[in-house]
Amino acid sequence: MKKTGYFLLAVIVIVAATGVGYWKFSGNPDALREIVLEQCLPDQLQHQNPAPCAEVKPRAGYVVFKDRHGPLQYLLMPTYRINGTESPLLLEPATPNFFWLAWQARGYMSKKYGHDIPDSAVSLAINSRLGRSQDHLHIHISCIRPDVREQLDNDLTRISTRWLPLPGGLMGHEYLARRVTESELAQRSPFMMLAEEVPEARDHMGRYALAVVRQSDDSFVLLATERNLLTLNRASAEEIQDHSCAILSSR
């Protein structure tokens, strides 16, 4: 009976998880890809106009796009087909360091806001295969939740340069945390750090979500959470973000 109960619970969780989507593009999981490949990229190449994207960099291989959810949220996406965290392309040395590029694009938030936004209020996040509803790699550039910001501030000295469990997790889910310098982040992709340093991660990258947050000592914290349906964790690192940017009103 116990085994049957666990099985039914797992089925319910899977159905619920796959039925929840963040994007509402008429159920089209390729909506973002179509925007990038059929609108932004052609407009830039043919007319030197990135619209509807905010920026298109064909040679560097990425675009920046204003997300319609939240006043300041942007997305960084590749100009070619990469589905998400499960893609082996992310572990190729020639692939752009998309997280570093996303961090460089944070200035779009300040420009939209009309004032400088402190780095401590910004976060980057990418969801797992099950934690997303769009099948084109996209890194969310948005505000961090105030409570997550406070927790990471309190854990500043306890976060190691190795991947270790974050005490207490975040948002009720288990997270691994790793501290890196700005130079490390610029030179090495967080996807590669996760795949090469966390046992068995390389073979199951699609199960993971990743986030990047700046700390008060100018280091960065990499955060990773792995899908676990029995604990209702779809591995959506976007959960540490607040697209309403309440953290800005408290400063």
UniProtKB/Swiss-Prot annotation:
**Principal EC category:** hydrolase
Keyword list (alphabetical) reads: Cell inner membrane, Cell membrane, Hydrolase, Lipid biosynthesis, Lipid metabolism, Membrane, Phospholipid biosynthesis, Phospholipid metabolism, Transmembrane, Transmembrane helix
Q: What GO biological process terms does the UniProt entry carry, in alphabetical order?
A: CDP-diacylglycerol catabolic process; phospholipid biosynthetic process
Q: How does it sit in the membrane?
A: Single-pass membrane protein
Tell me what reaction this enzyme catalyses: a CDP-1,2-diacyl-sn-glycerol + H2O = a 1,2-diacyl-sn-glycero-3-phosphate + CMP + 2 H(+)
InterPro entries reported in the protein's UniProt record: CDP-diacylglyc_Pase, CDP-diacylglyc_Pase_proteobac, HIT-like_sf
Q: Which domain of life is it from?
A: Bacteria
Q: What is its main location?
A: membrane
The EC designation for this entry is 3.6.1.26
Q: Where in the cell is it found?
A: Cell inner membrane
Q: In which pathway does it act?
A: Phospholipid metabolism; CDP-diacylglycerol degradation; phosphatidate from CDP-diacylglycerol: step 1/1
GO cellular component term, pick one: plasma membrane
TM regions (residue ranges): 5-25
What are this entry's molecular-function GO terms? CDP-diacylglycerol diphosphatase activity
KW Lipid metabolism (keyword) present: yes
Q: List, alphabetically, the HAMAP family matched.
A: Cdh (MF_00319)
The record, for NCBIfam families, names: cdh, PRK05471.1-5, PRK05471.1-6
The family line of this record is: Belongs to the Cdh family.
Q: List the protein's name.
A: CDP-diacylglycerol pyrophosphatase
What is the native source organism of this protein? Salmonella paratyphi B (strain ATCC BAA-1250 / SPB7)
Q: The organism's lineage?
A: Bacteria, Pseudomonadati, Pseudomonadota, Gammaproteobacteria, Enterobacterales
Encoding gene, per UniProt annotation:
cdh
